């Protein structure tokens, strides 16, 4: 949702140094003749570090870097953001106890901002008996492992000073079985006589959950020492809340007000597909209720919901009127982005998918904001899906960060962290900051059976390597921030320039348009812009694997394998 206010934020791009690619050609392309390649090398400086528009500030040079200048970036003051998902326990430890905390996140805001992220999603921070904290024991507090409510308030203030939106996980589908509400209800049930009915006036908390004398299905678990069962879809330690109850809603409204007052800019609604199983109408009503309540507290409030389903179901949930749903159609090893990055999904099909989302989602909510992502805390890492192929990992990141809406990047994706196996603990490993400095290093979650998973080096190593995955992400995020049309523009397929190997999409926001051209194959592609009516546009920026520039001869651009070109 566009706002009129604008805030300035200068972000630094990565510095590229040439490095030869590793991939072997695997797809058809119209290749430039040798003499043309030589001409482009001479005229366009093919292989040199790319350049951005000039500002007064020039980056300092380190060993192996090339001097370059940067364009000042103006971030629109709206809910289109580049989000960084953080599992606090595994991110950065500020006090030496080997558990990440809120102050650790605050200490890494320079890094997060420098990367080009303009939003942060914190996985649950509320008190909980488990390491992941999706089973809450107090909706109005911070888990002592992570810090205090004042630590959160300061973090929110620090984010606001940097124009970074801070959202938190809001798991309202269930509580912990150790929550005082559930404990009180179970104690009451244990005192009932055989056959005696529940009296909610005697114990209001008995109405907060779904209790039954019958074990209605496998998701119902016995209340010890009673004839009663309770619903817990995920497991027995997470009893489902009865979200139909007004008393429950009043409790959750108190929680929402608490976090908004502390400085949260939005909520990620966990497990929204399961508020009531197979009841889209009820679930969307719950989302609408919570969103409307939060908007009363903060007119700029943002909400993104977890609807782990396909495009058509996600479209139905946009009928709630809430702004964003995670786009699971794009995510995970078999999602469209990773498949395209490894050459198993055509460039044209990817553009067709963009148009399809736009049509389906906007029909339900004209102010929709897509929430694309590659992976999250419940999925394997992108590097695993791509068998640690550095070029493919970069390409996947480039595709994600040129999608419309608000992309979400899971911490560690920017350095190619890995997480083999099916255990959730293995997907939430300690952030790999340095090989030589243990400061801030956390322990892996208890139960994880593998150590740090990265074939590409730590943050420290990759920062000094201009062609690293990290610096590729920095360039991609910077390109996104320099061109607000990428996130906000209405998409139109450039039919004449859409093939299996390459494709172009036009993005229009207000009176400004850009074109995004993708070459997802391993081979160079010669693309005649005139065929798509784009010949009047100039190259605005590019993403290439090793810092190559995209050459242009009259109306023809020569795109290296696995590259993205922005035209304006």
Please place each PLM-identified region on the residue numbering.
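Conserved alpha/beta catalytic core and glycan-binding cleft of carbohydrate-active enzymes
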Residues: 177-178, 183-184, 188-214, 291-435
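Bacterial N-terminal signal peptides
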Residues: 34-43
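Sec-dependent signal peptide cleavage junction
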Residues: 44-57
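Active-site groove signature of glycoside hydrolases
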Residues: 253-278, 367, 372-379
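C-terminal beta-strand-rich structural cap/linker in extracellular carbohydrate-active enzymes
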Residues: 551-568
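Loop/helix patches that line or flank the sugar-binding groove of alpha-linked glycan CAZymes
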Residues: 373-376, 387-514, 520-525, 559
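Acidic/aromatic-lined carbohydrate-recognition and catalytic surfaces
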Residues: 59-250, 261, 268, 272-320
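Beta-strand-rich binding/interaction modules
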Residues: 524-547
